[in-house]
Curated annotation (Swiss-Prot):
It comes from Caldivirga maquilingensis (strain ATCC 700844 / DSM 13496 / JCM 10307 / IC-167). This is 5'-nucleotidase SurE. It catalyses: a ribonucleoside 5'-phosphate + H2O = a ribonucleoside + phosphate. Gene3D superfamilies: Survival protein SurE-like phosphatase/nucleotidase (3.40.1210.10). The gene is surE. Belongs to the SurE nucleotidase family.
Length: 270
């Protein structure tokens, strides 16, 4: 398959490097991704200035992978990449840090990228993995083996899609995998996302010149509703698979969940 790969952590993140290199062993892979870290930018687009894109030769990626950097957002990267390469599917990730709960749909650049592709008509997979809390908004030095579990799942889904077609009634899939030490192979197809996971507050401080500065930060809310993606992820250590449906679907939700469960079951057992 012809695959477009992007992310919001920047094209030097080991998550996207590992994913692209692995996919390129079996598929035609093009990477178009932000040059720098752009976490929590959602599906933002650039309209107030030109978007620059250039071939990137900074190493890290294996020879077959075609790599471009952009000064735009993940959504811009997908828009440009679809116009340039006409991919059959877009894969966004692997994001450093999970994207669990309803807020992630509006905040995550990883998910924003596949929302953009879906609006154009190209299905997408957004993939995220749990990392230590202090690493969520930086690029930690994580070995490529850390991503082996979720990369295996992504490759399995793509191989299934290549053989049997995309999941009927679904625009995109969002995958969230616990850290390797917490994941034992369990999974859940999500029909309800947790509404709010953190109680945010304003943290006030000062810069070296004495000017006031502010941070948004918060602690995890407790307890978690047991029928949500957050509970399955944080409390049960399960891979969560969330179907994203933009608008009405002629396929019933129960049928969608059943078909995804069958797909993921085959992938996990493989």
């Amino acid at each position: 398959m012809r695959i477009l790969v992007t992310n919001d952590d920047g094209l030097t993140s080991m998550g996207i490097v590992t994913l692209a290199n692995e996919l390129a062993k079996e598929h035609e892979v093009h990477v178009v991704a932000p040059e720098t870290q752009l976490s929590s930018i959602g599906a933002a687009r650039t309209y107030n200035r030109p978007i620059r894109i250039w071939r990137w030769n900074g190493g890290l990626y294996n020879g077959p992978v075609d790599v471009y950097a952009t000064d735009g957002t993940p959504s811009d990267a997908v828009f440009m990449g679809i116009n340039m390469f006409k991919p059959e599917i877009v894969v966004s990730g692997v994001n450093l840090g999970e994207n669990v709960g309803l807020e992630s749909l509006f905040i995550s650049g990883t998910i924003g990228a596949v929302i953009q592709s879906s609006l154009i008509g190209v299905p997408g997979i957004a993939a995220s993995i749990e990392v230590p809390p202090h690493s969520k908004f930086i690029i930690p030095q994580i070995n490529g083996d850390y991503f082996s579990g979720i990369v295996k799942v992504i490759k399995g889904i793509i191989n299934h899609i290549e053989a049997e077609g995309w999941v009927k009634g679904v625009d995109a899939l969002s995958l969230n995998m616990p850290s390797p030490s917490r994941w034992s192979g369990g999974y859940v197809v999500v029909s309800r996302m947790a509404k709010r996971l953190f109680k945010e507050t304003v943290i006030e401080s000062s810069d070296p010149r004495g000017n006031k500065i502010y941070w948004r930060w918060g602690e995890e809310l407790m307890p978690l509703d047991t029928d949500t993606d957050a509970y399955a992820f944080y409390r049960e250590g399960k891979l969560t698979v969330t179907p994203l449906i933009l608008g009405d679907s002629s396929t019933g939700l129960s049928d969608i969940v059943r078909s995804i469960e069958e797909l993921i079951s085959k992938v996990i057992r493989a």
